[in-house]
């Protein structure tokens, strides 16, 4: 009888532990896709070592900025063979780079983010691995080979530090999905940002995403494709993909002097290519863009960077903030190395980003309302409405004074609220805007 009771006690204890673990992984819900405010974490701007702990110490600050999803760049061990020290050259998909910490540190970061109302998605590199990945020794057939049987780096790239994976091999596909499941079921992450997703077969993503949603055990997961192929949605099952086209248009308008209305045309084109309800991730920078220049450098000034941010996110979300832009970090960032960022610098810029993100989040008419546009060469002008609240947004895309002479009649001679200052204003038929000035007006 004692032995029987002991076995019963152990069974109950194990069941209780399993229930607790399941509750820890299921007691937090993702924001709706069209409510996502994503913050990209490059661990190498937080600390030279033990970076995950350093990121965890800033979770409250990131949440206070307005983020509800944290995207963490690759945290896995980096290969040593042919290495460029890129975090996208992975030697083991189920371990953490000692430079950043441990799996326990990652679990703690996820738990702290959830406690602060943020989801966590991990960067996932499915297209290629490091040359000394644990798979290479025993599974050479999992890699793409040339006619002589030599493993090759990804065709059409200069990524010589990584080996191209062979998606004709079903065993490799299964191993890849198993590794992704590990981070969902054992660590509790809420999804993935999938690197160069367009280079991986869409039918793989369909299978992987289906299995991940089942493995999540009732939790929703967020899947973001770094790519612009509509197949990401129609075949693969992703929730979001990249607005690379809009980023290119933004540079042409703000930097090269193209018409402001080109942004409207690009927006219509991008959203016209994807299924209704899916979201393009809009950004003024990310880890790739930041290797070339900071937003301050690219858009000519802090004011230019903020104007570009308003044009990008208020026209049509989703929203991405790359960790460092909120404090107007002035230089480019090479994510292959540690780059210290002073998080206490430029508090007035941080306050402005907070205000803009709060306006975006607190007003569904802006984040997901109906869009009416008013094309102009030098001012991006558009209206957002949910038929209860109406907003007129004007963005001077030039580093010079500009007059917008086509104020819609319904916005003329009305009492309007400037959402940034709280002041009441009235508009006539035209308005003059200072260099890179933007106005967010509520009727």
Predicted regions and their residues:
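Sec-dependent N-terminal signal peptides
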Residues: 4-14
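Short, solvent-exposed turn/loop segments enriched in Gly/Ser/Thr/Pro and often Arg
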Residues: 71-83, 123-132, 195-201, 225-230, ...
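A structural motif
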Residues: 67, 189, 238, 317-318
């Amino acid at each position: 009888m004692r032995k029987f009771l002991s076995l019963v006690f152990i069974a109950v204890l194990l069941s209780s532990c399993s229930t607790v673990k399941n509750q820890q992984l299921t007691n937090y819900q993702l924001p709706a896709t069209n409510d996502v405010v994503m913050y990209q974490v490059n661990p190498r701007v937080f600390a030279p070592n033990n970076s995950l702990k350093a990121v965890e110490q800033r979770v409250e600050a990131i949440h206070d900025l307005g983020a509800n999803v944290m995207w963490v760049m690759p945290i896995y061990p980096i290969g040593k063979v042919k290495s460029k020290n890129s975090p996208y050259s992975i030697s083991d998909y189920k371990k953490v780079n000692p430079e950043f910490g441990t799996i326990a540190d990652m679990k703690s970061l996820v738990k702290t983010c959830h406690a602060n109302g943020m989801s966590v998605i991990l960067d996932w590199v499915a297209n290629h691995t490091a040359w000394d990945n644990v798979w290479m020794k025993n599974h050479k057939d999992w890699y793409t080979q040339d006619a002589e049987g030599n493993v090759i780096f990804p065709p059409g790239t200069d990524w010589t530090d990584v080996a191209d994976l062979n998606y004709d091999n079903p065993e490799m596909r299964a191993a890849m999905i198993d590794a992704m499941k590990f981070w969902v079921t054992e660590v509790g992450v809420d999804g993935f940002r999938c690197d160069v997703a367009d280079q991986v077969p869409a039918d793989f993503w369909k299978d992987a995403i289906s299995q991940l949603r089942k493995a999540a055990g009732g939790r929703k997961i967020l899947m973001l494709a770094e790519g612009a192929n509509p197949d990401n949605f129609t075949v693969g099952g992703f929730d979001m993909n990249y607005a690379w086209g809009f980023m290119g248009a933004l540079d042409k308008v703000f930097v090269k002097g193209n018409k402001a209305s080109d942004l409207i045309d690009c927006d219509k084109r991008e959203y016209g290519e994807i299924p209704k309800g899916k979201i393009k991730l809009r950004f003024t920078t990310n880890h790739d863009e930041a290797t070339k220049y900071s937003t301050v450098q690219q858009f000519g000034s802090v004011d230019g960077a903020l104007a570009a941010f308003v044009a990008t996110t208020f026209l049509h979300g989703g929203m991405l903030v790359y960790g460092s832009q909120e404090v107007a970090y002035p230089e480019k960032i090479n994510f292959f190395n540690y780059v210290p960022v002073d998080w206490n610098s430029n508090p007035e810029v941080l306050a402005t980003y907070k205000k803009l993100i709060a306006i975006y989040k607190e007003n569904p008419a802006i984040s997901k309302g109906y869009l009416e546009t008013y094309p102009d060469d030098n001012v991006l002008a558009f209206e957002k409405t949910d038929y209860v609240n109406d907003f007129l947004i004007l963005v001077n895309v030039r580093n010079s004074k500009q007059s917008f002479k086509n104020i819609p009649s319904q916005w003329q001679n009305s009492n309007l609220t400037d959402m940034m200052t709280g002041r009441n204003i009235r508009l006539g038929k035209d308005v003059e805007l200072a260099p890179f000035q933007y106005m967010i007006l509520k009727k």
